Structure formats: structure tokens, C-alpha cells
From Swiss-Prot:
Gene3D superfamilies reported for this sequence: 3.90.70.40, S15/NS1, RNA-binding (1.10.287.10)
Tissue specificity of this protein: Ubiquitously expressed.
Domain remark in the UniProt entry: The UIM domains bind ubiquitin and interact with various E3 ubiquitin-protein ligase, such as STUB1/CHIP. They are essential to limit the length of ubiquitin chains.
Superkingdom as given in the UniProt entry: Eukaryota
Active site positions: 14, 119, 134
Subcellular location: Nucleus matrix; Nucleus; Lysosome membrane
Protein name, as recorded: Ataxin-3
Regions crossing the membrane: none
Annotated UIM domain residues: 224-243, 244-263, 329-348
Outcome when changing residue 14 to A/S: Loss of enzyme activity
EC numbers, comma separated: 3.4.19.12
């Protein structure tokens, strides 16, 4: 395979690659093919001028671009045909009635030139084997004798024009070498664009793998994962503790409410204190604790006797009413205090969960 000359695609110079792959050497350059195209353009201009240089057809012809070449590097079949005439070679359309009447088996030919739209490539026999020398491939593609006819038929189905190259091709090293040996191809060549895409994909995968390995070898990778896990566990435990505290607080509220309800039913109707402000609750708590402290100090004084006769004389009904009022006030203070504590705990829990 190394001895086979194979030019790969550059720009749109497929006609040049086709000719050089056919002749197995750097026989033509873009400049030489452009010169042939200009000669053809001049010959066409002279033929059009025969009808008169002032005619409408002639002026229209001059305004049109060349049909034999363009700026991209494309060359017409006329350019390729004239270039081959230099070497005594001739092109015949493969599916023309004239050639089909000859009933020649394709494997008995020496080479073909295939064209689809603006792309040209060569299929040539080197030694005793056929090769697809398409410049869009990464290398020559081996074609068996049995597959050659199917390959050409497939190209025709795809819209290709196929030309048979008639004449004696120049001698080349690959043809002489392959007359003595046969080559085997384990892997078929890929299209150049496909190969580039495959190489880019492999390069990207390799780069990703290297980044993963570098990250895995780094000391901070697993430490970061462990820190994240510990933070998640701590937040989970904190939420559970807050839920437990909320449940305990609700049970305390319920018990307090039950005790307050029983005391109220025995003495007087229940009065609501949930509408009290925080400042009023604070003042009531201070008054309650000052009263308790004052009573304790009085009880600790020497000679202090706690007899009912020393208290102001009131009726038994008035005494019960006063005691019930004091009891209600204390119970209301306790219940309101617990309610405020519960609301504060709920607000703290919501703020923590938002974080």
C-alpha cells in the first residue's frame, strides 16, 4: 500500500487529485490545469465570435463566467479530457450505447474516472488488483474483482457519471510491485472528515479521562465529599431535634390548657388572654414574681403570723372570687407565655429550613 501514490483532498482540487492518482505521480498542478481551461475558454470565444462580435449571444457569452473552471479549483470534464490527451489517453462514457455494445467486462479495463456534481476520483487497476483512489479517503481502498461491477453499478445508481480511460498509462512503481505480490487490507480507509471527527472525539475523551484521573488523585476530592455528607447529616439532625422540641412544646401547651380549663370551670368563666401584647405579658409576669417574692419575705420575718383574722374582713364569696381571679390571671399568663414561645420556635424553624 505504501508504494501507491494517493493525493488527499485539498480545497476543491479534486480534478487535479483525480488525474495525479490515475497517472500515479505529480503530473499536473492547478496552474497547468488553469492554463488548459483558459485555452478552452478562448476556443469557445472564437467560435462564438464567428456569429458576429456585436451579436447578443456573443455579448452574453462574454458576461458569463468560465464553464471550464472556477475560483474554488473545480475543472470541467473538457479540462480533464484535454489533460489526458497529452499522455495519449481518451475518455469514453461507461454507460454510453457505443461502449455497452462492446460488452467489455469491467475487470478487463485498466481504469475509470468517476464524477458526481463537482467531485472527481479515480478507480484504477494496479498489478492484478483494483483500488479506489478517491481523494476524500484517508488511503487507497482495495476492491475485489467480484465487487468491482457491483461498485460501479452502485455509483451509477447514486448519480455518478463513469468514464473508461482508454490507452496506455505511464509505468509506475506500484504497478510493477503489485504484479508480483498481492496486498491484503485488514481495515478499510475512512472518509477524511469522518477520520478527523473520530480523532477529535478520541482527543476529547482522552482529555476528559485525564481530568477525571487528576481529580481522583487530588487530596481534596474525597475530603470535600465527606464534608458535604457531614453537613447534610448535621442539618438533618437539627431538623429532627427542632421537630421533637415542637412536639414537646405542643404537649406542654395541651396540658396547660387542660389544667386551666378545669380551674376556670370550677371558679369562673374562662377569659381569653391570647390577645395580650408582649409588653403586657412581661408586666404581668414581673408583677406576679414580685408578689411571690414579697410574700416570701413577709413569711420569713420574725413574729409573722398568718391567721385569717389578720386579713381584711370579707365575705366567703368575695374571698373565693378574689382567689379565682388571681388563679385565672396566673394561668392566663402561663398560657400566653407558652403560646409566644411556640410562635417564636416556629419562626426560627422556618428560617432555618430556608437556609
Amino acid at each position: 500500500m505504501e508504494s501507491i501514490f494517493h493525493e488527499k483532498q485539498e480545497g476543491s482540487l479534486c480534478a487535479q487529485h483525480c488525474l495525479n492518482n490515475l497517472l500515479q505521480g505529480e503530473y499536473f498542478s492547478p496552474v497547468e490545469l488553469s492554463s488548459i481551461a483558459h485555452q478552452l475558454d478562448e476556443e469557445e470565444r472564437l467560435r462564438m465570435a464567428e456569429g458576429g462580435v456585436t451579436s447578443e449571444d456573443y455579448r452574453t457569452f462574454l458576461q458569463q463566467p468560465s464553464g471550464n473552471m472556477d475560483d474554488s479549483g473545480f475543472f470541467s470534464i473538457q479540462v480533464i479530457s484535454n489533460a489526458l490527451k497529452v499522455w495519449g489517453l481518451e475518455l469514453i462514457l461507461f454507460n454510453s450505447p457505443e461502449y455497452q455494445r462492446l460488452r467489455i467486462d469491467p475487470i478487463n479495463e485498466r481504469s475509470f474516472i468517476c464524477n458526481y456534481k463537482e467531485h472527481w476520483f479515480t478507480v484504477r487497476k494496479l498489478g492484478k488488483q483494483w483500488f479506489n483512489l478517491n481523494s476524500l479517503l484517508t488511503g487507497p481502498e482495495l476492491i475485489s474483482d467480484t465487487y468491482l461491477a457491483l461498485f460501479l453499478a452502485q455509483l451509477q445508481q447514486e448519480g455518478y457519471s463513469i468514464f473508461v480511460v482508454k490507452g496506455d498509462l505511464p509505468d509506475c512503481e506500484a504497478d510493477q510491485l503489485l504484479q508480483m505480490i498481492k496486498v491484503q487490507q485488514m481495515h478499510r480507509p475512512k472518509l477524511i472528515g469522518e477520520e478527523l471527527a473520530h480523532l477529535k472525539e478520541q482527543s476529547a475523551l482522552k482529555a476528559d479521562l485525564e481530568r477525571v484521573l487528576e481529580a481522583a488523585d487530588g487530596p481534596g476530592m474525597f475530603d470535600d465529599d465527606e464534608d458535604d455528607l457531614q453537613r447534610a447529616l448535621a442539618m438533618s439532625r437539627q431538623e429532627i431535634d427542632m421537630e421533637d422540641e415542637e412536639a414537646d412544646l405542643r404537649r406542654a401547651i395541651q396540658l396547660s390548657m387542660q389544667g386551666s380549663s378545669r380551674g376556670m370551670c370550677e371558679d369562673s368563666p374562662q377569659t381569653s388572654s391570647t390577645d395580650l401584647s408582649s409588653e403586657e405579658l412581661r408586666k404581668r409576669r414581673e408583677a406576679y414574681f414580685e408578689k411571690q417574692q414579697h410574700q416570701q419575705q413577709e413569711a420569713d420575718r420574725p413574729g409573722y403570723l398568718s391567721y385569717p383574722c389578720e386579713r381584711p374582713t370579707t365575705s366567703s364569696g368575695g374571698l373565693r372570687s378574689n382567689q379565682a381571679g388571681n388563679a385565672m390571671s396566673e394561668e392566663d399568663v402561663l398560657r400566653a407565655t407558652v403560646t409566644v414561645s411556640l410562635e417564636t420556635a416556629k419562626d426560627s424553624l422556618k428560617a432555618e429550613r430556608k437556609k
